[in-house]
Swiss-Prot record:
Cellular component aspect of the GO annotation: cytoplasm
Active-site residue numbers: 116, 256, 286
Pathway involvement of the protein, from the record: Lipid metabolism; fatty acid biosynthesis
Name of the protein described by the UniProt record: Beta-ketoacyl-[acyl-carrier-protein] synthase III
Subunit structure: Homodimer.
EC number: 2.3.1.180
Length: 334
């Protein structure tokens, strides 16, 4: 029997219309456009406004677009899985809400939480469903409404985050396309350094936790940067070397968009020019699990069948990883 690979056959995406600029941020906290651009490379970010509007709002729109672009009957979708740190609710799953509103009524659904590396974890999980031979249509949704857990009184974190969500369709192929290799790593030593301290079962919500602003992102920026800048570059180089890929073989690097300096370090480690690196951090900021699928969505019309892509990410946990992806079709962005 021929080996089954899981190939991406379509990409959908959604970014909110409302823009929050560095000038807007500078009116909230003591910072400047120059400082934010120099430190992280972000000019503006998108924010999802509206009461009762969560990640599913963006996920539904990304999936509807994906289904339309791939001419797929939603009732044919067998799995909908969502990678996010900011679900609509602790329960039910955001995937169940997305599946319901997109007509994927025959799909099993579940959520995953891999922080900023969430898309890589979800992509490998979805690919394994395809590789099993039991599933033919798997939708991977990945994104975050980071503004819902961003403290706009904290000058060290509030300039960093935005909202976005992407979705990809995975299907089987016996050709050498798709998710060809994956490396995923975790080191729990990092958990105290990038965390939402309260709201879970360890520290349930209380007046005290709310007063202490413990329901927002906390980050020890220096520690996180030190690990991220080396781990993300190292794992990207490792997967390229493991698969015999030189800088000439790599069509695109698709990095998590957390910090322009980390992206630059990853490109340099691979010996790849920056014009072969997908960068949109200046427009959207760090959308956590949304960054990589939104890059694929924005660059889809530039991708060619057979292009070698290296996806790399680093996030809370610490979690990090890389995926070697051989693109399966010529760009057809709607």
């Amino acid at each position: 029997m021929d080996k089954i690979n899981a190939v991406i056959t379509g990409v959908g995406g959604y970014v909110p219309e409302d823009v929050l600029t560095n000038e807007d941020i500078s009116k909230m906290v003591d910072t400047t456009d120059e400082w934010i651009m120099t430190r992280v490379g972000i000019k503006e970010r998108r924010i999802l406004k509206g009461e009762g509007v969560g990640l599913s709002y963006m996920g539904i729109r990304a999936v509807k677009q994906l289904l339309e672009k791939t001419n797929l009957n939603p009732e044919e979708v067998e799995v909908v899985l969502t990678a996010t740190t900011t679900p609509d609710h602790h329960f039910p799953t955001t995937s169940s809400i997305i599946a319901y509103h997109t007509g994927c009524k025959n799909a099993m659904t579940f959520d995953m939480q891999g922080a900023c590396a969430g898309f890589l974890y979800a992509l490998e999980t979805g690919a394994n469903y395809i590789r099993s031979g039991r599933y033919k249509k798997v939708v991977v949704v990945s994104g975050d409404k980071m503004t819902s857990i961003t403290d706009y009184q904290d000058r060290s974190t509030c300039p960093l985050f935005g909202d976005a969500c992407g979705a990809v369709l995975l299907e089987p192929t016996t050709e050498e396309f798709g998710v060809l290799d994956t490396i995923l790593r975790t080191d729990g030593v990092g958990y105290p350094h990038l965390i939402m301290k309260s709201g879970g079962s360890a520290y349930p919500p209380s007046h005290e936790t709310v007063d202490n602003r413990e329901h927002f992102v906390y980050q020890d920026g220096r520690v996180v940067f030190k690990y991220a800048v080396s781990y993300m570059a190292d794992v990207a180089a490792e997967i390229a070397e493991k698969n015999g890929l030189t800088h000439d073989d790599i069509a695109w690097i698709v990095p998590h968009q957390a910090n322009l300096r980390i992206i630059d370090a990853t490109a340099k480690r691979l010996g790849v020019d920056m014009d072969k690196v997908m960068i949109n951090i200046q427009k959207y900021g760090n959308t956590s699990a949304g960054t990589i699928p939104i890059c694929l969505w924005e660059w889809e019309n530039q991708l060619k069948k057979g292009d070698n892509l290296i996806l790399a990410a680093f996030g809370a946990g610490f979690t990090w990883g890389a995926v070697y992806l051989k693109w399966g079709y010529d760009g057809k962005k709607a």
